[in-house]
Design a protein with these regions (language model features):
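Surface beta-strand/loop "capping" patches
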Residues: 157-174
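Substrate-binding/catalytic cleft of secreted carbohydrate-active enzymes
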Residues: 1-153, 158
Length: 174
């Protein structure tokens, strides 16, 4: 109720509001943002650009991919139910970047969830891991850097796509 009152005070023109809940049984609050997790929790990642272009989809406020710590696989076709490797994460995220850039005239923006993989107290992870080591925490492993702030392959992929080489050149060897 307190969050609803704050939102209403900040934007008295808002006719509808998103559901406001506590997260994972915790004491904090959260309100739902527009999300598109195609390729991560199901759905077809190749339709991401078309989904962003829909009239009711002006912004994607959350998208990402699971990964398994330091697990690498050989490149190949994207597999929707493939191994949650660093390589698959990069492939999924780069597909979303490419399709979002193609749809940029139809959408005001998108942002990736989340910069840093983080501890997620109260969250049970019985099925959200590929290997037992991924259940350490529990952590949300969708970040561009590890919980210890080590950049991942996907971090460098984003940097290569969004930081001009003329401004800040980089070489990344895998």
């Amino acid at each position: 109720q307190e969050c609803s009152e704050i939102i209403r005070e900040m934007d008295p023109t808002a006719r509808t509001m998103r559901i406001i809940t506590t997260c994972n049984g915790g004491e904090g609050t959260d309100w739902n943002v527009i999300q598109n997790w195609s390729g991560t929790y199901g759905g077809d990642v190749t339709k991401y650009g078309k989904e962003l272009s829909q009239k009711n989809q002006l912004l994607n406020g959350e998208y990402g991919a699971w990964r398994s710590i330091d697990l690498h696989t050989e490149p190949g076709e994207f597999e929707a139910n493939g191994v949650w490797s660093e390589s698959r994460m990069c492939q999924l995220m780069e597909t979303k970047i490419r399709l979002a850039e193609q749809a940029k005239d139809s959408v005001c923006g998108q942002f990736q969830w989340i910069f840093s993989s983080h501890d997620n107290p109260g969250r049970r992870q019985p099925d959200e891991a590929f290997r037992k080591i991924d259940k350490v925490g529990p952590f949300n492993y969708k970040g561009l850097v590890t919980p210890w702030e080590e950049p991942l392959d996907v971090y460098y992929m984003y940097r290569a796509n969004y930081v001009p080489a003329a401004k800040d050149p980089m070489v990344y060897l895998v």
